[in-house]
Amino acid sequence: MTIINNNKLKVIIFDFDGTLIDSNNIKANAFVKLYSHYGKEISRKVLNYHNQNLGKSRNSKFEMFERTFLNKPFNNKIGNDLSNKFSNLILDKLLDAPLINGTEKFLEKYSKDLKLFIASATPENEVKLIVKRKKLNHYFQGVFGSPKQKGDIVEKILKIYKFKLCEF
């Protein structure tokens, strides 16, 4: 059974969380845990915002939580501190998280004929580590993450590899 008609298709650019790895609940729980000491109402707002903005970087979420939900100042140091705490909560769990059902079979089949990439809002160093530990790195031409924006990553891939929009 053919999943994709790849007569014109030359490239696939994947998101990471919830697309290749079953990680959305791990991250949702970590956001709630980080903000639980502010009470149930803030935790509920944090969870709702996270679930409605899955493709946004954690730093942009932290800025929203701090400025809007808590009425607190936000700067790079605060963002980095929160991001480090968040990483400490999730990294081991992400390394143990299962792949989305069918991921490896799909990658095995299509990596032979197509160029595969990851463009994620997760920090690039974390995505690369997880992909390597799960022994998936040989399927991908490139693995990219934040602080770069997904749109910028896609533009870079198109430009460097000279792909046309109709080819992905």
Residue ranges and their predicted role:
Residues H37-I42, L70-N75, K135-Y139, Y161-F163:
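Short helix-capping segments at alpha-helix termini
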Residues T2-N48:
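Active-site neighborhood of HAD-like aspartate-dependent phosphohydrolases
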Residues E66-E104:
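Metal-dependent phosphoesterase signature
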Residues D96, F117, E124-F168:
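Substrate-recognition "cap/lid" segment bordering the active-site pocket of phosphatases
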Residues K40, R44-K56, E63, R67:
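N-terminal polybasic phosphate/anion-binding patch
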Residues K8, N88-I118, E124, K128:
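Short, acidic loop-to-helix structural element flanking the phosphoryl-transfer center
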